[in-house]
Amino acid sequence: MKLLTLKKAHAAKIKKGYPLIEKEALAGSAGHMKEGDLVDIVSESGGEFLARGYYGLQNKGVGWTLTRNKHEQIDQAFFLSKLTKAAQARAKLFEAQDTTAFRLFNGEGDGVGGVTIDYYDGYLLIQWYSKGIYTFKDMLISALDEMDLDYKAIYEKKRFDTAGQYVEDDDFVKGRRGEFPIIIQENGIQYAVDLNEGAMTGIFLDQRHVRKAIRDRYAKGKTVLNTFSYTGAFSVAAALGGAEKTTSVDVANRSLAKTIEQFSVNKLDYEAHDIKVMDVFNYFSYAAKKDLRFDLIILDPPSFARTKKRTFSAAKDYKNLLKETIAITADKGVIVASTNSSAFGMKKFKGFIDAAFKETNERYTIIEEFTLPEDFKTISAFPEGNYLKVVLLQKK
């Protein structure tokens, strides 16, 4: 077994359950390592055994711990144990009649960092986040085959190109190829999903509870603006909740046809709603000039985005984006402020919110908060894994 030696301070983090092996934690070079190598992680002070894991480059990490038992083998039985435990924890979701898509295995939260598995009405989607974890593909899929999942097919997304980008490929792995789009249900809402059309599927499963809240408690009789709307999933939830009108804005050309599709599978008249393909920042300027006001605004930008004209980073730019949102929010209107950035926590996010309102001389109250749903399992030792922060604010 190859050894990976960590600096003393970082060894203490691993001892407390931190699962990511950070680049800066290494005491010396990892030049002798190759992606997928199983490693024993030891402290530079006396060579104390800390954990067993694998080497795989991912963002700021060089791998993940898998067990703190030096006698445990990392084999098919290991993966089967982790997968079985994860499936058992989601038994209620498997049985649910009105929800047929959810996260089956959530990386380090379920014991194996660098890989996630989503369940889409009988289809499995595996996402690999490093070449290292990808070397365990056959072992992991064989473990899945030992389970009583009765899946229709397995698809995959390889997200380990330069800077963690998606590797364009035919994503079919095994089983019966799906005829896409398939229609999944989420709390009774129908969404069209394609597992073999690029990096994304058409729905972000981690926002399930937020869409339900919008439909059930916030949309009725309201004018709704959905920014960075992607396929319009929030807009559909609002329309089904009785919104007077929704406006969906996204810069991607594909968003128009995809949003029409999501309205149509729910038997909603998409022509009664506005779907705009344009830069959200330009739309804010347009709305301010036209003196438009919305009762409910959904603000869920990507953590990082680059267009021809600008670069957006949630960590740097969310406050200013929120200031523009506040300007077109009606009195007593609600803003769904959301971010999936793992670069900062809820406390800092609330700091952005507070600063935005102070700088616009407006007041607000927090009426509801969300983090990841229960199927996106996290561990307290790795707060970065609980990346989703959603705060519902009412403008006073």
Swiss-Prot record:
GO terms for molecular function: methyltransferase activity; RNA binding. Belongs to the methyltransferase superfamily. RlmI family. InterPro entries: PUA (IPR002478), PUA-like_sf (IPR015947), PUA_sf (IPR036974), RlmI-like_PUA (IPR041532), SAM-dep_methyl-trfase (IPR019614), SAM-dependent_MTases_sf (IPR029063). CDD domains: AdoMet_MTases, PUA_RlmI, RlmI_M_like. The gene is ywbD. It comes from Bacillus subtilis (strain 168). Keywords: Cytoplasm, Methyltransferase, RNA-binding, rRNA processing, S-adenosyl-L-methionine, Transferase. The lineage of its organism: Bacteria, Bacillati, Bacillota, Bacilli, Bacillales. This is Putative ribosomal RNA large subunit methyltransferase YwbD. Residues 1-79 form the PUA domain. It is an enzyme of class 2 (transferase). It is found in: Cytoplasm.
